[in-house]
């Protein structure tokens, strides 16, 4: 937002560590509240307003219709619980967690010292106003100094907290890795010494008892190669023998086409002879 004349900042309300400010509409409770870390109380004429210090999410609401409440931030609690729970589940050894950690602490000290040096370098730059605009810009300078100090303290605290959590997590993970490697080495050392002990297999029981005596070896039958042509010739000869034995039997009767023709001819001849005999009888009787 841009103003033709900057409003008067009455005070700045900030939340404690682990808490946040909730600016809620007292007349319309269904409206979602604004959850911020700091809020400014400004005055325009005779009316007071709440303005967010974080310019990425700006809002300007009348102070008469809104109320400010301090609520606990749930993110910090969840993060702390997750770290503690993860360490307890994985390691389970309190002695390893209590071991001194030298390297992470040194890195934390270096980060804190660098952040302090940056704050010391930035302070004189912000706090050195131009002499020409010293009188009319006094309120702005005070407001900027106050905001910068508050935000610097919060940034330092957040960096220290994050660096401590990272150092604890790195140290615990390093301890767990060391213990796991030691256990793996301890488990692998007996395997390398006695490789034959682990190599075993279940042998089926013998089919004969020792009291029955040794089993005599069976004579292996010689395997001979069979020629296909010889086997076919043998089958043909056997089939011919079977057919000849069937034909040689006296009880069998053979019906062929020639026998059928001869039987038909004999029947025709007998019928002709009968007709001729009947004709001769008639002629003789007439005479």
UniProtKB/Swiss-Prot annotation:
Residues 109-175, 203-223, 257-287 are annotated as: Disordered. Signal peptide: none annotated. InterPro entries: GrgA_tf (IPR054977). It comes from the Bacteria. Residues 110-136 have a biased composition (Low complexity). Belongs to the chlamydial CPn_0623/CT_504/TC_0791 family. This is Uncharacterized protein TC_0791.
